[in-house]
């Protein structure tokens, strides 16, 4: 969860924790679940403030973080610290080693929307990865996601969705825009 939930609901972290425990016990009485409140920077890098545009659970003890280190290194550090404090090994996507926003106009225009790759849809062993319509960048995102899942020993197929998602990804409050593939499913 993003700590944006605290502001939107005018609740303190302690108040939220109390509510969460009661809600969880009421709905799933014989199980337990721990949550992580991720800091939301509230900027253009994740305008919606949903965790599925920031991080992806890969497997027990491992998560995949979007390319915040490319966008906002200090915020990436805060996210990693919060996740590592909860015992997660953090893998990260990164595109700056491969693309230069100062030299590449297409990449520069899409740079703030690269978070969309983490917002892929998982259906059992199939990962459906959104695309931004820039083939080199789209391929690099798919490659990195494959590497992380393979490294984790998870056998899955990664499918790039052959559809330019940028009209959906780019925030448009008038038309309820923003989000990516995973967001569209709920």
Describe the residue ranges of each PLM region.
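Histidine/cysteine-enriched polar flanking segments
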Residues: 1-186
């Amino acid at each position: 969860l993003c700590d944006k939930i605290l502001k939107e609901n005018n609740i303190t972290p302690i108040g939220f924790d109390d509510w969460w425990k009661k809600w969880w016990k009421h709905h799933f009485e014989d199980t337990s679940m721990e949550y992580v409140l991720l800091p939301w920077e509230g900027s253009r890098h994740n305008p919606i403030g949903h965790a599925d545009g920031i991080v992806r659970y890969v497997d027990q003890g491992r998560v995949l973080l979007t390319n915040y280190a490319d966008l906002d290194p200090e915020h990436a550090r805060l996210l990693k610290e919060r996740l590592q404090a909860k015992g997660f090994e953090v893998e990260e996507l990164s595109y700056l080693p491969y693309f230069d926003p100062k030299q590449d106009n297409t990449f520069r225009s899409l740079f703030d929307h690269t978070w969309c790759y983490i917002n892929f849809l998982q259906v059992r062993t199939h990962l459906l990865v959104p695309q931004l319509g820039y083939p080199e960048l789209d391929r690099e995102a798919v490659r990195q996601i494959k590497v992380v899942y393979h490294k984790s020993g998870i056998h899955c197929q990664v499918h790039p969705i052959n559809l330019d998602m940028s009209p959906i990804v780019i925030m448009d409050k008038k038309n309820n825009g923003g989000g990516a593939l995973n967001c569209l499913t709920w």
